[in-house]
UniProtKB/Swiss-Prot annotation:
One of its GO terms (cellular component) is small ribosomal subunit. This is Small ribosomal subunit protein uS12. The gene is rpsL. Residues 9-18 have a biased composition (Basic residues). The keyword rRNA-binding applies. One of its GO terms (molecular function) is tRNA binding. With S4 and S5 plays an important role in translational accuracy. InterPro entries: NA-bd_OB-fold, Ribosomal_uS12, Ribosomal_uS12_bac. GO terms for biological process: translation. The keyword tRNA-binding applies. Belongs to the universal ribosomal protein uS12 family.
Length: 124
């Protein structure tokens, strides 16, 4: 525990919170161009081919983003909107593509949780 004199000299340092999505630089989303679209395998107990893309953001940083939902139309040079949000079983993937925005099409035949995948309400 510091003495009063030490507190007078130095004071208390405020705790600095580290951001979980540094490439967005405090913005909710960022636009970027896909430089590579590929699949990866997840960490140990899980098994799948997760769809990911390497994206160069408009602020110059290059990040790996996850493409959520079943099926996608992304390829090299596609322009995508990137949001924060990690994928627990893919190490180093801290961002996701916003479906239904820019070049990323919405998920087809989506009935539930539609807003997350950019799917419009189906007509009766």
């Amino acid at each position: 525990m510091p003495t009063i004199q030490q507190l007078v000299r130095k004071g208390r340092r405020p705790k600095v919170n580290k951001t979980k999505s540094p490439a967005l630089r405090g913005n909710p989303q960022q636009r970027g161009v896909c430089s590579r679209v590929y699949t990866t395998t997840p960490k140990k107990p899980n098994s799948a081919l997760r769809k990911v893309a390497r994206v160069k953001l408009s602020n110059g940083t290059e990040v790996t983003v996850y493409i959520p939902g079943e099926g996608h139309n992304l390829q090299e040079h596609s322009i995508v909107l990137v949001r924060g949000g990690r994928v627990k079983d893919l190490p180093g993937v801290r961002y996701k593509v916003v479906r239904g925005a820019l070049d990323a099409q919405a998920v087809k035949d989506r009935k539930q949780a539609r807003s997350r995948y950019g799917a419009k309400m189906e007509k009766k």
